[in-house]
């Protein structure tokens, strides 16, 4: 019977199953069945006064009335405490039954089951559900019960009323399972393989075994990836790092030796390390060659004339070990002159652009001599009187004339290693050494610029410095070319030949300007300040001198055929 909280009450007896639910109308559904032994149930006595219109009769009263309805006299006798009997006619009974809304139809398809005397309250049953589904094993028992009830209904006459139940109950085991486990809402979309516990178990062979559909959600996405393997790799890497760190903190020296041993044995065996030849860098080769030549020269001098070498060595020590006393200014005039020179040099350094190379004047302490002096020394040393250009210049031009060097981006602009430039320059000037084949192109190009910059007399000479500046003030290039031609005829022959060969080489460099990014103007910026210099710092205008030198070199490169048409 139905309670206030929407609960369903199932009354179970040995021969009858009744279920009532609360609704706007009081209704009663009774399913009559035959007991397993085939005997009819005994009806207890009930009071007819309780069967009034609108009242709900009890099951015992209704069974008693139906029992007496089947008797021949068609009357029902009720005994009370005062032993009074009341005879109720069958018509009155039918009218009372109609007012009680009793369904007197028997549905053969309804399921009738035999249960014990037990009342089960199902809190999880909802009125919106039509009925519970029965198991297959319960269907067999219900079929046997229905057959017995059909046989019983055939024996009875038309007055036999079959009462059915609209809601049949399930087995006790099923109801206990429903009441014990609450209804849990499942996740609609379940993604496997991204940090959640999957419903699909991945197998080793690459396939997967799905769990039952009831245990999964409506939409399950299976990602067959190797996240497990990746997580294992990460964990292993973390463990290795932590173990290495621990060993490093415990014994740093042993850890270092172990890593060095692994590094050496990773690529080469011990035998390979012994057989691999040593390939020093170009700078190392230059230093070793220079030192070897120096030692050979000293050994030769000692063997030829030991006394002379000893006297020269003592003279050298006396000069360098002699203390130098700073000279004090003799007068205020000399002091003012010295201060003016300092101001001029400082103003020049401030006005000089960072991107432009520094200007080295003829008073530089690093001067290596003029072209004539260098060429004369080389002729005596090598015994070649036909040499017309310094060997350093010819070696640099020959080394940079191949296509690979000419395609080097930033040639003459990118700086090279200063120590390698210095060592290579000394080796060539003193001993005429060759340039190593693996030498950097930027080292050689910077050495050529440094050679031109450290000449005691610049290539365009101090004497004609102002003349070159004045030619660049002319109106057009034709006049400038004509004036420069006349000036070039006045400078020494060695300088003329060097300018011609250098401009010829720079024209070749500009032919690869789309690769090396060195146009005529860029080359003018690199060589102008090194070849056109003022006689002294006090007599030069830095801006005009730099612009004039750049313009002269650019004009020579762009109009090489006009200058040297022969």
UniProtKB/Swiss-Prot annotation:
GO biological process: chemotaxis to cAMP; small GTPase-mediated signal transduction; sorocarp development
Keyword Cytoplasm: yes
Chief location: cytoplasm
Biased composition (Polar residues): 36-56, 327-337
Annotated segments matching region Disordered: 1-56, 65-84, 128-168, 322-366
Keywords of the record: Cytoplasm, GTPase activation
PROSITE patterns for this protein: RHOGAP
Location relative to the cell: Cytoplasm
Protein name (Swiss-Prot/TrEMBL): Rho GTPase-activating protein gacH
The organism of origin for this protein: Dictyostelium discoideum (Social amoeba)
């Amino acid at each position: 019977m139905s309670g206030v909280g929407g609960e369903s009450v199932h009354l179970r007896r040995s021969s009858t199953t009744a279920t009532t639910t609360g609704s706007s109308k009081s209704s009663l559904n009774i399913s009559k069945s035959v007991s397993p032994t085939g005997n009819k149930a005994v009806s207890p006595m009930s009071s007819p006064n309780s069967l009034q219109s609108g009242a709900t009769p009890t099951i015992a009263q209704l069974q008693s009335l139906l029992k007496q309805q089947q008797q021949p006299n068609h009357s029902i006798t009720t005994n009370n405490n005062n032993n009074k009997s009341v005879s109720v006619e069958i018509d009155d009974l039918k009218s009372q039954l109609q007012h009680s809304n009793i369904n007197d139809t028997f549905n053969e398809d309804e399921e009738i089951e035999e249960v014990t005397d037990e009342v089960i309250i199902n809190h999880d049953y909802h009125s919106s559900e039509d009925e519970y589904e029965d198991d297959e094993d319960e269907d067999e028992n219900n079929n046997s019960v229905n057959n017995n009830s059909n046989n019983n209904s055939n024996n009875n006459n038309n007055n036999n009323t079959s009462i059915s139940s609209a809601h049949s109950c399930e087995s006790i085991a099923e109801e206990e399972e429903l009441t014990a486990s609450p209804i849990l809402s499942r996740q609609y979309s379940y993604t496997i393989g991204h940090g959640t516990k999957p419903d699909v178990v991945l197998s080793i062979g690459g396939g997967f075994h799905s769990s039952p559909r009831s245990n999964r959600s409506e939409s399950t996405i299976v990602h067959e990836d190797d996240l497990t393997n990746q997580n294992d790799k990460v964990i292993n890497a973390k463990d290795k790092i932590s173990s290495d760190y621990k060993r490093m903190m415990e014994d740093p020296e042993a850890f270092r030796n172990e890593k060095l041993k692994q590094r050496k044995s990773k690529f080469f065996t011990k035998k390979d390390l012994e057989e691999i030849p040593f390939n020093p860098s170009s700078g190392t080769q230059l230093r070793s060659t220079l030192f070897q030549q120096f030692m050979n020269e000293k050994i030769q001098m000692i063997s030829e004339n030991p006394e002379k070498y000893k006297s020269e060595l003592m003279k050298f020590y006396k000069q360098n070990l002699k203390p130098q006393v700073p000279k004090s200014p003799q007068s205020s005039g000399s002091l003012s002159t010295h201060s003016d020179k300092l101001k001029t040099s400082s103003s020049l350094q401030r006005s000089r652009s960072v991107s432009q190379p520094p200007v080295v004047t003829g008073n530089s302490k690093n001067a290596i001599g003029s072209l004539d002096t260098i060429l004369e020394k080389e002729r005596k040393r090598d015994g070649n009187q036909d040499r017309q250009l310094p060997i350093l210049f010819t070696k640099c031009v020959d080394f940079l004339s191949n296509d690979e060097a000419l395609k080097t981006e930033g040639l003459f602009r990118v700086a090279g290693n200063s120590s390698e430039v210095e060592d290579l320059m000394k080796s060539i000037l003193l001993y005429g050494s060759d340039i190593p084949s693996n030498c950097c192109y930027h080292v050689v190009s910077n050495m050529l610029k440094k050679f031109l910059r450290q000449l005691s007399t610049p290539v365009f000479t101090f004497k004609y410095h102002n003349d070159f500046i004045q030619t660049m003030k002319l109106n057009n290039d034709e006049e400038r070319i004509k004036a420069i031609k006349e000036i070039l005829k006045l400078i020494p022959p060695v300088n003329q030949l060097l300018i011609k060969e250098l401009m010829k080489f720079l024209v070749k460099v500009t032919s690869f300007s789309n690769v090396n990014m060195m146009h005529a103007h860029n080359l003018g910026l690199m060589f102008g300040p090194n070849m056109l210099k003022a006689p002294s710092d006090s007599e030069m205008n830095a801006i005009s001198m730099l612009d004039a030198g750049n313009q002269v070199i650019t004009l020579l490169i762009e109009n090489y055929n006009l200058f040297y048409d022969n």
